[in-house]
Amino acid sequence: MTTLTRIIVTSIISMLMFSCNFSMQLGEGVSGNGNVIKDERPIQNNFDKIKVSQGLDVHITQSSTPSLTVEADENLMDLIMTDIEDGTLKIYSSENIRRATSKKVLVNVESIASIKATSGSDVLSKNTIAVDQLELQTTSGADINLDVKTNHLDCNATSGSDITLSGETTTLNASATSGSDINAQHLKAETSNVKATSGADISVNTSKALTAKATSGGDIRYSGNPEKIDKTDTSAGSVRQE
């Protein structure tokens, strides 16, 4: 995108996110007491999807032995909820947490199909997540950082959120909008289908085929010397090789 467009888009997004974060800090909420404890919680039902929100941190480990452990300030422990409904592990807080020494949830899971992170939450993998298909969604300033090995990977980032990927996949489908970033330059893909709009950025590493569309100040960068390229850039969008 042009320098002027990038400045305008970045400024608007920064002001919106600052306003949101400022409001959250001034609003009512509970602060941690600094005494961090662990709580290993029972897993009552099977799940292969994870949804996390409200600024909590989730560390995922692929393991044949499922487990669920919360590490948090003692007075915040009962506020951090971990419910399993219809195959989805929902991780959230029952009240606003203003400050915490720790608000971490450690999840060991054998297989995972979907991860959704919202409202400033952070999700990262502690080892390589090896599955056939995986769907990732981020919004409202949330972050996902994963190392993966998949055949089919779908990513969607909106509203100033970020997805960072490494590893390998056969097919990558990625969409980013509203100032979000998808950094997949360390993810080796054979085929990539990507779309960036409204000031979003996507970087990919693809070897065989790339279909890329950038509009409204979106920016797509690619590496890997794909054999086939189909690219479209309009309305100050940009598709370029790194």
For every predicted segment, state its role.
Residues 1-158, 162-177, 181-242:
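Intrinsically disordered, low-complexity terminal regions
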